[in-house]
């Protein structure tokens, strides 16, 4: 059930089918025409860079901000703590598409329409509620005796956070970081809605496809009759899956530990 569709996608990627879906699992004469078409006749490299930059910003900046906030909620007592946690919990119940109009107005007011990297603001904000609760639940299970012992030895709060808390939280942080990388990687809704407008003061003859992400660009190959190319779509899908596969292979141990930790400590 799983292997056959994968083989079919690979077979389609190595064929040269532009308008019709191939009716065989593997082409009789495999070739690289679809890959050449992607790199030579489209802005695929630009789409890839736009998506990769958004995902990396979301992963690094988002993980740092969420980890810091989760540490504060897990280790400190302050006025409004319970209300803040309750608010974050409630925000998880609302789907992201409910805020599309507000997102458009926000981007329009700040002249961010057509700016791919600006999407990171929305992705980071949208990932805060669930991931903050996940990391906060993990950090709350780390004994506070470790903090007190370190303070007796002369460590301050920042040193405790960096030298004790972070090393112990590597599994859950890795899980959250990879999840935040995957979030914008193949998302179509936000870029499809906010990147269809030209940026402010765009020059004459501006190619709007330069600001697309992978999802928006690849979807054109199966949705636009003038550019329909199923083999190019399949070839792009294979290249899209490479970073995710590499991340899972590199951090498999930590991801499994993070999933288990989230299931038992969240």
Task: Give names to the regions the model predicted.
Residues 1-266:
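A structural signal for multi-pass alpha-helical bundles of membrane permease subunits
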């Amino acid at each position: 059930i799983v292997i056959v569709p994968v083989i079919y996608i690979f077979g389609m990627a190595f064929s040269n089918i532009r308008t019709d879906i191939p009716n065989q699992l593997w082409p009789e004469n495999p070739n690289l025409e679809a890959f050449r078409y992607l790199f030579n006749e489209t802005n695929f490299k630009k789409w890839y860079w736009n998506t990769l930059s958004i995902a990396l910003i979301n992963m690094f900046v988002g993980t740092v901000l969420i980890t810091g906030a989760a540490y504060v909620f897990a280790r400190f007592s302050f006025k409004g703590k319970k209300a803040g946690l309750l608010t974050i919990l409630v925000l998880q119940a609302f789907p992201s598409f409910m805020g599309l109009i507000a997102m458009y107005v926000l981007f329009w007011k700040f002249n961010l329409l057509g700016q791919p990297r600006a999407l990171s603001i929305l992705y980071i904000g949208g990932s805060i509620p669930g991931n903050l609760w996940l990391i906060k639940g993990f950090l709350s299970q780390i004994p506070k005796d470790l903090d007190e012992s370190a303070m007796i030895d002369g460590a301050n709060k920042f040193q405790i956070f960096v030298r004790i808390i972070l090393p112990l939280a590597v599994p859950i942080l890795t899980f959250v970081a990879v999840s935040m990388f995957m979030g914008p990687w193949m998302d179509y809704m936000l870029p499809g809605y906010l990147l269809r407008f030209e940026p402010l003061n765009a020059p004459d003859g501006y190619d709007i496809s330069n600001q697309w992400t992978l999802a928006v660009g690849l979807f054109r190959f199966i949705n636009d009759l003038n550019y329909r190319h199923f083999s190019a779509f399949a070839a792009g899908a294979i290249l899209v899956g490479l970073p995710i596969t590499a991340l899972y292979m590199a951090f498999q141990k930590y991801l499994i530990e993070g999933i288990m930790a989230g299931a038992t400590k969240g």
